[in-house]
Amino acid sequence: MKREKRTYREMWGKMISFFMYDGMKKDEYATIQGEIYEKNLRNMTIYSSVSAFLFLGLYISSYLIDSIIGNRFLYLIQFIVSFLVMCAFRTIAQNHRAAGESVKYIFEVSLLSFGIVLGAIKSPEAEAAVFIVLLVIIPMMLYDVLLFSVLIRATMIIVYVVIALQTKDMGYCSLT
């Protein structure tokens, strides 16, 4: 009986280590945490800058291309969010680690929300690829994927599936 309890504790400890400290021991993770934060900050600054310019380009293109005119408001909102996140990464996040982590998660949620609105609400059958691509790309930009980030993605997947199933039953809706 003692051996089973110890085995479960060891397994639980390994799971916690994997999700909380990226598979390392707590002290090993603590030694490289500053470097990870700097690399994540650099990557998220680049990613939010590219995202802001991409959404600005899509917003401008929506005046020229009739097929994306219905998403103009979404592009504008996501451009504003991406621009504000870019500014936050370049200013506030440089000096305040907690603020930088919060902004990182806010940016992740905003991108996944954009994918949900575009994919699940606007047309669940045709544009689900946007949400899936964002689910794949966002973790590739980070050096460590902690438990909170995994929980955000799991929650957004559940929200996406529920909304997609409901809008599929009700028919498509338009946000414009």
Where are these regions (language model features)?
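Generic hydrophobic, helix-prone segments enriched in Leu/Val/Ile
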Residues: Y29-K39, V117-K122
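Non-catalytic regulatory/interaction regions at protein termini and inter-domain linkers
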Residues: M1-E35
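Intrinsic low-complexity, intrinsically disordered segments enriched in polar/basic residues
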Residues: K2-K5, K26, K39-R42, V81-V85, ...
